[in-house]
């Protein structure tokens, strides 16, 4: 199995080089969150462009562990990295939005967490593109097949990228690749989380498990409760996977 995974890794590495050539770019950059998906992508882009790849760690009131795991990942992959703390910028934008909406008695407290977490993802996206534009690099996404199918990403946030090298990998395959690529044990063993708030986990937020999503994507039978959740997530996130609608005029 390891041999097959290595063959697939080599194929994706060559694909990454081809994408950069076709775009007339010079290299690749990725946001390193301290999680498994970004760790795999960081290792892949380092293999594709040893001298022209950059990891960017973008904490926004993030846990110390996430930052530590991001650094561990970069060091394990051997990829050059920078850290840009966006906590102050996030506070500035969030506070201004809340203040102005409150002035008009429009602020919806029930949507504050969604607003806050999506703002974090979009600030990171904007910053990644600022870095990429300066270096003439492409921004590489980290979403896997389970996340894309369920829409577990922020529109124009972590979903705002140039290329998606692991979009066809189910979550368990991401772990298999991570082991072959030498991703640190600390990252392999941590519970998947977007780090959006204290105690937040991917599976807790989605309402189902990656195991069941992977099995669903492979056409296997899963519990009815989880099937209902997955189908609802897919249906409600259709707008994230398509161009914005526009009317036909005339």
Swiss-Prot record:
GO cellular component terms listed in the entry, alphabetical order: cytoplasm
A family per Pfam: NAD_synthase
One of the protein's GO biological processes: NAD biosynthetic process
Enzyme class of the recorded protein, top EC level: ligase
GO MF entries: ATP binding; glutaminase activity; metal ion binding; NAD+ synthase (glutamine-hydrolyzing) activity; NAD+ synthase activity
Positions contributing to Mg(2+) binding: 37, 147
Disulfide linkage: none
Pathway recorded for this protein: Cofactor biosynthesis; NAD(+) biosynthesis; NAD(+) from deamido-NAD(+) (ammonia route): step 1/1
Coiled-coil residue spans: none
Keywords: ATP-binding, Ligase, Magnesium, Metal-binding, NAD, Nucleotide-binding
Binding site for ATP: 31-38, 142, 171, 193
Binding site for deamido-NAD(+): 122, 155, 162, 239-240
Record function comment: Catalyzes the ATP-dependent amidation of deamido-NAD to form NAD. Uses ammonia as a nitrogen source.
Family according to the record: Belongs to the NAD synthetase family.
PANTHER family per the UniProt record, alphabetical: GLUTAMINE-DEPENDENT NAD(+) SYNTHETASE, NH 3 /GLUTAMINE-DEPENDENT NAD + SYNTHETASE
NCBIfam families from the UniProt entry: nadE
Protein name, entry field: NH(3)-dependent NAD(+) synthetase
Lineage: Bacteria, Bacillati, Bacillota, Clostridia, Peptostreptococcales
